[in-house]
From Swiss-Prot:
This is Large ribosomal subunit protein bL25. Residues 10-21 have a biased composition (Low complexity). GO terms for cellular component: cytosolic large ribosomal subunit. Transmembrane segments: none annotated. The gene is rplY. Belongs to the bacterial ribosomal protein bL25 family. CTC subfamily. HAMAP family: Ribosomal_bL25_CTC. GO terms for biological process: translation.
Length: 206
């Protein structure tokens, strides 16, 4: 069952760049909630809440219970626009969720057991092909993350979709059967010891 994260927001009446700038001058982040065949809802957020979610990670697959003037809407945070210089959030897009309507969402992958992997202990290199996977999911069962155990991987072993934990309620959108998530590659040639140099030849006798 999806865990909802509560977010308090305030309504704002006007759309447009000028209204958004005014919201920022008031110390808030302008945002919009769209989808579920309803009119978009214009809201403003405390920037500290947005930064908190960014720092937590996994916000793209987290379901939020956005409360505006006492009414709440389940929604996904689809995009956070950042200022090009300060990297502060300047706008947020939410997608309102409708019960029973599946959505596409990026779910992050958490890697564990790297320090116990026989292949990595022998000098192998972990190559992560995908840090996230896009899946189709019911809003009531969106996983916040998938987990994969690397502790048994040797050199040339790999991790695939079927090896991930927590995928039972979702379907990957990538149309490749059991695609690769990560591999343990052999050490590169640059890391192998160089052969000892041959001794210099003795000078010829005159």
């Amino acid at each position: 069952m999806t865990q909802f994260t509560k977010l308090e927001a305030s309504s704002r009446a006007k759309a447009g760049k000028g209204a958004a700038r005014a919201t920022r001058r008031d110390g808030q982040v302008p945002a919009v909630i769209y989808g579920a065949k309803q009119e978009p809802t214009l809201v403003a957020l405390d920037p500290r809440l947005v930064v908190r979610e960014m720092q937590r990670g996994g916000w793209r697959s987290r379901v939020y219970d956005v409360t505006v003037d006492g009414a709440s809407s389940p929604a996904l945070m689809r995009e956070i626009q950042l200022h090009p210089v300060s990297d502060k959030p300047i706008h947020v897009d939410f997608q309102r969720l409708a019960a029973g309507e599946r959505v596409h969402v990026e779910v992050r992958i958490v890697f564990t057991g790297e320090d116990k992997s026989p292949g990595i202990k022998r000098g192998g290199v972990l190559n992560i092909v995908r840090h996230t996977v896009e899946v189709s999911a019911d809003p009531a069962n969106i996983p916040e993350s998938f987990t994969v155990d690397l502790s048994q991987l040797d050199i040339h072993d790999n991790v695939r979709w079927d090896d991930l934990q927590g995928t039972g309620s979702v379907t990957p959108t990538l149309q490749i059967p059991n695609f690769v998530i990560a591999t343990v590659a052999a050490p590169s040639a640059d890391e192998t010891p160089e052969p000892a140099a041959a001794p210099a030849a003795a000078p010829a006798k005159k």
